[in-house]
């Protein structure tokens, strides 16, 4: 129930999308990262929202890094100069993972993890969410599990 509440809060209140609150967790897996371990740059095409819950962090566990989609713009584009660094104009944002914390982000957002330090470990549970009903105003469709 808690994960569902976090999902709907993120999708509806944070991102501002119109959606039902009901969702499926389509995938869920445990990550145990030993010293020097990392995750390469990737996204989750099978999810509207992805997330990671940090179960145990020890030593220098390495943060999750989110890449700004604007850092690889489609051409042509208009370049601008950064006035002050924000989450919207930086090339990437450090997710600063913390034990007991759940991070949610759009599933299509490229991300990776920094390597864990010596004598460090990071244990997390990652997941992907899909809404039970997709709606685009005049039409909608339901997602079912088989």
Give the location of each predicted region.
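N-terminal leader/capping segments at the start of a protein or of a new domain
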Residues: 1-10, 136-146
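Signature of the catalytic double-stranded beta-helix
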Residues: 1-37, 41-43
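Residues that flank catalytic or metal-binding motifs in active/ligand-binding sites
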Residues: 26, 47-49, 60, 121, ...
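Catalytic core of non-heme Fe(II) oxygenases with the double-stranded beta-helix
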Residues: 33-104, 134-143
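Short beta-strand His + acidic residue motifs that chelate non-heme Fe in jelly-roll/DSBH
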Residues: 39-42, 111-118
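A short hydrophobic beta-strand segment most commonly corresponding to one strand
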Residues: 51-53, 119-135
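A hydrophobic alpha-helix/topogenic segment detector
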Residues: 91, 118-119
